[in-house]
Amino acid sequence: MVKYLLFIIAMTCCLCCNSFHKYPTVKIRQSMEKDTLLKSFGFSYIDLKGYKIIHINKRTNCILQPLVPLNKGEDNYFRLRIDKDKNTVYQIDSILSVGEILYNSRTMGIIIPITKYQNADDFSTVGEIQYFNTDELLSDYIEKNLENSEAACFDNRGLFCLYMSADTLFAYNIPTKEKKSIFIFNNPMMYSVELKLKNNILTLIYYPNFVEDFSNFNSAKIITFNYQE
């Protein structure tokens, strides 16, 4: 009887472990691709009229704050501050643009995709994705070299961050801090704007080419994937 119980416990632990480490998969849905028009990518300095407050939960807010330029050419940057119970618990400086800030109530984690630099010659961008846990007040980098993208989202359980960097879709295991490529577009000129997961359909909005002026309408594409965990 004892051996049988130990066997059941071992099998349960094994299944949980496999589920915990198993990476999601995607399969492109043909014929769902279509053109759309977007006015901007993320939230940039030109959209910022003073302070902007983004409510995360009852105790936590994100505040976007313009930076006072010290030198000429530095007036396009702003600061992101996370306040909990009216106290600043985290801060990111020198932000050019921020994508959609996402909160997962199960894990109490926040995903913050940001752009820090745009090349003046080819308009490519470099940024990062940061993760912050509002309960434990711990931060981490999901991606330190985010290329031409602000598209990121949580999986259904809040254990993975799905995101685009350059022309590759990644799945990042937040607890183990490991990432894996799960789809490649083979289009080095694409710029990813938004990634959303709903009802096991993963939707990506992207520009097929780099865009110079993000304040005007630009032709973008929407493509969907069948998503499986």
Regions inferred by a protein language model and the residue ranges of each:
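C-terminal motif of bacterial Sec signal peptides marking the signal peptidase cleavage site
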Residues: 13-16
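Acidic, small-residue rich beta-repeat scaffolds with periodic aromatic anchors
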Residues: 24, 55-56, 190-229
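Repeated scaffold domains used in trafficking and secretory/extracellular systems
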Residues: 48-56, 94-105, 147-154, 188-196
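Short beta-strand elements that form the blades of beta-propeller/WD-repeat-like
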Residues: 52-55, 60-72, 106-122, 158-164, ...
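Positively charged n-region of N-terminal signal peptides that target proteins for export
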Residues: 1-4
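Intrinsically disordered, low-complexity segments enriched in Gly and acidic/Ser/Thr residues
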Residues: 150, 154-190
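Sec-dependent N-terminal signal peptides
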Residues: 7-9
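Surface-exposed loop/turn elements that mediate protein-protein interactions on large endomembrane-trafficking
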Residues: 23-44, 76-92, 123-144, 169-183, ...
